[in-house]
Amino acid sequence: MARYLGPTCKLSRREGTDLFLKSGVRPLESKCKAETAPGQHGQRRGRLSDYGVQLREKQKVRRTYGLLEKQFRSYYKEAARLKGATGENLLKLLESRLDNVVYRMGFGATRAESRQLVSHKAILVNGKALNIPSYQVSEGDVIAVREKSKNQLRIQNALGIAAQRPDVEWVDVNADKKEGTFKRVPDRVDLPADINENLIVELYSK
C-alpha cells in the first residue's frame, strides 16, 4: 500500500506541531523550525480561514497516524455509523489499530516503525502472527513481540524511548517479556488535548 516516504520533519513543520514521526523524545524545536512552513525559505503562517483551520487539523491527525486520505475518510465514515460522538469514535478507531497499539506499548519508536514490525510478522496477537497494521485490537487482546524478533536492537531502543514518555493507561506492558495487554479502548480524556476532532467532523460534514 502506498505510503508517504518523504521527509517527516517537513510534515511536522507543515502542521506547526510535533507529529512524533521521528524516534526519540526531543521536542520538535530541536529538530526543525515548527513556526515556519516547509521549504528553504519557509514563510511565517498567515491567518487561516475556517476551512483552512479544519483542513490543517484533519491533516495533522491523518499524518500523525500515518494514513492516506482514502483510509482516513473510511475511518470517518465508520465512526459516523457508530453510536456516540463521531469525532471521539474516530479517535478510538485510530487508537485501536494494531500498529498504533504496538507503538503505544513501546515496541516501536514511531508508528511507522511499529507498522513495519507488524508487516514483517514480528508481532503476535493472542499468540498468532498478524501482518495487518489496520487490524482493530479488542479489549483483552495480548500483543507480543515474536520470539525470534525480541533481540532486535530497534525494539530494545524503542522500549528505552517509551520509558521516557508518560504512561499509557489503557495498555499493560511487561517490557522484560516484550508483551502487553490492551486493557480497554482509551477514553477521550486519555488522548491528547491538542487534537480538536470536532474540526474534522465539521470538515467532512460539508
Swiss-Prot record:
One of its GO terms (biological process) is ribosomal small subunit biogenesis. GO terms for molecular function: rRNA binding; structural constituent of ribosome. It holds the Pfam family S4. The keyword Ribonucleoprotein applies. Keywords: Ribonucleoprotein, Ribosomal protein, RNA-binding, rRNA-binding. Residues 96-156 form the S4 RNA-binding domain. It comes from the Bacteria. The keyword Ribonucleoprotein applies. One of its GO terms (cellular component) is small ribosomal subunit. Coiled coil: none annotated. Belongs to the universal ribosomal protein uS4 family. Part of the 30S ribosomal subunit. Contacts protein S5. The interaction surface between S4 and S5 is involved in control of translational fidelity. One of the primary rRNA binding proteins, it binds directly to 16S rRNA where it nucleates assembly of the body of the 30S subunit. With S5 and S12 plays an important role in translational accuracy. This is Small ribosomal subunit protein uS4. It comes from Teredinibacter turnerae (strain ATCC 39867 / T7901). The gene is rpsD.
